[in-house]
Amino acid sequence: MKRLAYIDWMRGLACVLMFQTHCYDSWMSPEAKKSSSLIGWSRLGGTLPAPLFIFLAGVSFALVTEKLREKGIARNAIAKQTILRGAEIFGMGLLFRVQEFALGYPWSPWTDLLRVDVLNILGLSMVLMGVLCWATGEGVGAAARIRTLVAGIFAAVLVAMATPPLWTTYRPRFLPWPIESYINGVHIFKEPQPWLFPLFPWSAFAFAGLAARFFLFSDLARRREGLAFAALGGAGIAACYLSVLLDSSRVRLYAVYDYWHSNPDFLLMRCGILLIILFLVYAWCRWGLAQKGFSPVIQLGNTSLLVYWVHIEFVYGRFSILPKGQCSALKATAGLITIFLAMLGLSLARTTWKKWRVRALQKNPAATAAPAGS
């Protein structure tokens, strides 16, 4: 099995699901949305990309952290490197909002500059994971891994349990709305908005991904990797069942019960689905056809940030390739295929350029040494 192919495949899956959700939502007319069942299936698939991206950020964060630990790098240095990377992603999220505002001017409201989007929360989640891994990373070996695993689970549970009151009875109303929006996604509205990406509950997916990957670093998981992934898949099924069981219970922990948006039971269900997908994708990459020849899904996963950034403007923005809200299901599907092929071409161009640049630097090492000596 090629190293970490399952991660790129999952990212690529998130990209494909994101494309179809955005394309149908942006281009289909209201009449087409009412008359076609396609939009319902599209929206169902659209519930997965954001959790997948954030969960995989936790998985990748664990990989980077453990690799640095194994090299003997001090935990302060690891924390500095990973937290700065999180800050960089957060900065890119702010830059993305500036770009969207500029391209949408004069129709975009200035408040869109302060909207909490998925890149913002990805960056902040990475910062928080950096702090957590620093706190649990003293020493080396299994002890540090177990501490980080337990802390990741605890952090995910804490975020999930704190979400309902922070959305309802204990909202931090004393904060300015741009700050409160990072807590519960209230933005400029009277109530938190489920289409935004506040820390509560979205950062829980990152902590869940972190914990899942540190479980796979255990000695048993390294010896029996397939069995370990199957165990995660089984845990996912159990989590889904437990979520349904808790939802059907008469016991209510919170004054306001909203299963589909802020309740921990729903987050448990979504984490369970992510673990099931993780196992299925791993199995597909290891024993299936995922790596037989060229894989468009893996290719998109290699450049997920790039295609996320670029496709938005050609679907929702000023340069939309089809008229927004005016297309039939068939026409929107044709547009979706066009976006998919265009983003795949962009992804290939990006990776080809990177490979060419690496080869050029290897052939001319003096080019990389020159700046250091100048």
Residue ranges of each PLM-predicted region?
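Alpha-helical transmembrane segments and their immediate juxtamembrane cytosolic regions
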Residues: 1-374
